[in-house]
Amino acid sequence: MGKFSKIKKVQEEESAHQKMEWEAAGAKDSSSDDSSDESDNDDQPKQATEETRKRAELWTNRERVLVLCSRGADVRTRYLMKDIKDLLPHAKGDSKLDQQKSLNVLNEIAEMKNCTKVMYFESRKRKDTYLWMSNVEKGPSIKFLVHNVHTMKELKMSGNCLRASRPVLSFDDAFDKKPQLKLIKAVLMQTLGTPHHHPRSQPFVDHVFNFSVGEGDKIWFRNFQIVDESLQLQEVGPRFVLEMVRLFAGSFEGAVLYDNPNYVSPNVIRREHRKGQHSYIEKQLAVKASNIKQAKVTEILAEKTVDLVGKEFDTQNNAAADSEAAAQITAQIEKRRVRKKKSQASKYTGSD
């Protein structure tokens, strides 16, 4: 029994020694794998940091746009603001601004958000929408009245552009003819143009922002998709019209550089429309009264009246029948008028 116990003890020692060797070898392999993984992981952040550093060096235009609206904005204005945020990768949003606050508060909010430009949609009476575009640092700021708003969801056009892609800004030749339009063109380029090498932008161009000048210096905005290499255009949306109200030297303040003489307030237009409606209603009432009167006259004339006297006044039909009797009556009347002439004696002349 002693020999077997010794053999068993030796086998246990050998198995324990082999187990220790296997564990040591596994530890070496795991350490080598960990070191290789750590080296790979170290290389990845290094590459990422190098890419970000290169892109940061190329990203020289650090324009950021603050897009927000006032309280009481209607649904169409909110959807338009959402579409603009989707089209501008360098845009930042904020909560609605109370209308009781001064517009100068927007400059402080833009500085807190590290934004250099502001697009503020101001709604009045839940009917009229005004768009403010401002350069926070030095000005200027422009106030527009927004007409004919149609959002992407409403239009459902066939065109489609990728999100966060860079647009081509296309301007009408009329922007170079007037000084106020030149300034508006510069503000639109700085506000709506996506900076090159922006971190959130895609490195390609697939749509066009078109700005054209219409009657009364109204600016028409359209967004078109560039279809493949054929360079055909398909409208994407949104679409709206901007009518300039005033142009200020500062950011939401300062001297008035230009006041649009063709601008008419929506309140004045609604007042004139109401006046026109009142005059129109009066005209319609007068026409109705005259029509009723004419209908009564025609109805009276159409009725057949009965002559109660009989044939006495029917002179046309009874003239032939009563001609003899009438002749006798007239003869008697004329006889009475004829006087008998008395015979007069001849006067004495003295010749006898």
Swiss-Prot record:
GO biological process, one term: rRNA processing
Comp. bias regions, Basic and acidic residues: 9-22, 43-55
GO cellular component term of the entry, any: nucleolus
Protein name: Ribosome biogenesis protein BRX1 homolog
Function description: Required for biogenesis of the 60S ribosomal subunit.
One of the record's GO molecular function terms: RNA binding
Species name: Caenorhabditis elegans
Domain Brix: 63-253
